[in-house]
Design a protein with these regions (language model features):
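Conserved hydrophobic register position within alpha-solenoid helical repeats
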Residues: 322-327
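Auxiliary alpha/beta "docking" domains used to position bulky ligands
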Residues: 1-10, 15, 24-208
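Cys/His-clustered metal-coordination modules, chiefly Zn-binding fingers
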Residues: 190, 196-247
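Short Fe-S-cluster ligation motifs
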Residues: 240, 244-260, 292-315
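Iron-sulfur cluster-binding cysteine motifs and their immediate structural context
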Residues: 214-238, 254-286
Length: 341
């Protein structure tokens, strides 16, 4: 932190600090803390932006204008977008900034034993939510000694990341971060740390996407439309297998390849040429444990070891869809679609 000698140098008398010097010190201290936050996050491989909460108005306006123009499927809007809250939380009403973070995450390959066979299925990046707690703890440890706090947010993270320059959209409407591709998890925290940064530009697409159509060809559900910027999210396999409704009849069972989510448009993407090989081994579920999952048992009825494995994958809150998705992969009637990535 700044020494008293530097502080005194900016004032007429070391015993009396001028108003201008006090303001200068406060501004320097805020900038110093912001840079300290960014450096600490970068030490863990993360990238971040700190922007003024004024960006909230732009985010809300962007979502609502799309909705009013009829660009968003009504069911998708109701289930996925109406949950956002474009104002600081009650426990931090004086929030002045948003700390937007991209944390690198790998593919995780989990093993399920069923009918005597070990079957391996992928969980894509973004589902490992435990890193949110780790990031919040790091921010708290960094800012709390100087009297600043943080609080979680409920915001459209992809739009926020792109508008603040942290990421860029791919043609598949997935976010890409420099050095990570789409292998990351986004998060944002409110803070009462002041910020004058207000870079809220229009959504940008990766330059190489303009001459590439790999994801369009790879998308089984035709959710990626070459004639419009927005994804037909209501057709996206990720939306369908994260939703509790039955799969539509037009979904070919062979399209399923992840326990949740989809990687078809990401594994083929040139931006992921490096990250696509980042696969980590996940937990192994015994035949008994796999059977419990297929039996639709709620989390509270599962043994602690089994619940812990689900938490490791970030799927402990997805038990309303996981049994159905697992059945689609295993296919209890005989065939077993592969989940090779």
């Amino acid at each position: 932190m700044l020494s008293t000698g530097i502080l005194c140098h900016a004032s007429n008398d070391c015993g009396t600090e001028s108003p201008g010097a006090a303001e200068s010190f406060a501004g320097y201290n805020v900038r110093y803390l912001g840079e300290k936050v960014r450096q600490r996050l970068r030490a863990y491989g993360c990238e971040s932006r700190i922007v003024s909460v004024r960006v909230l108005r732009e985010l809300e306006s962007a979502i609502e204008s799309r909705h009013q123009d009829g660009d968003l499927d009504e069911r998708f809007y109701r289930e996925r977008l109406s949950i956002f809250r474009f104002r600081p939380p009650d426990d931090l009403p004086e929030a002045k900034s948003l700390i937007v973070i991209a944390v690198p995450q790998p593919l995780v390959r989990a093993t399920f034993v069923w009918n005597g066979r070990a079957r391996r299925y992928i969980v894509p990046p973004t589902y490992g939510a435990s890193v949110n707690t780790n990031a919040e703890d790091l921010l708290t440890r960094t800012l709390e000694p100087d009297g600043y706090r943080v609080a979680p947010s409920a915001l459209p993270l992809k739009l926020l990341a792109v508008r603040t320059g942290l990421a860029a959209y791919g043609k598949n409407n997935i976010c890409y971060v420099q050095g990570m591709g789409s292998f990351h998890r986004l998060m944002a925290f409110y803070s009462d740390l002041p910020s004058d940064e207000y870079s809220c530009g229009d959504p940008t697409m990766l330059e190489r996407c303009r001459k590439c159509s790999a994801c369009i060809k790879a998308c089984r559900t035709h959710a990626i439309d070459p004639d419009r910027f927005l994804l037909h999210a209501e057709r996206c396999l990720t939306f369908l297998n994260e939703d509790t409704a039955s799969f539509p009849d037009w979904v070919d069972p062979s399209w399923h390849h992840c326990l949740i989510g989809c990687m078809h448009c990401q594994t083929i993407c040139p931006e992921n040429k490096g990250p696509v090989h980042w696969v980590e081994a996940g937990p192994t579920f015994s035949e008994e444990e796999t059977g419990m999952l297929l039996d639709d048992l709620p989390l509270w009825q599962l043994p602690d070891d089994l619940a812990g494995k689900l938490k490791t994958l970030g799927l402990h809150e997805s038990l309303d869809v996981l049994p159905r998705n697992l059945r689609a992969l295993i296919d209890l009637r005989g065939s077993s679609p592969s989940a090779r990535v």
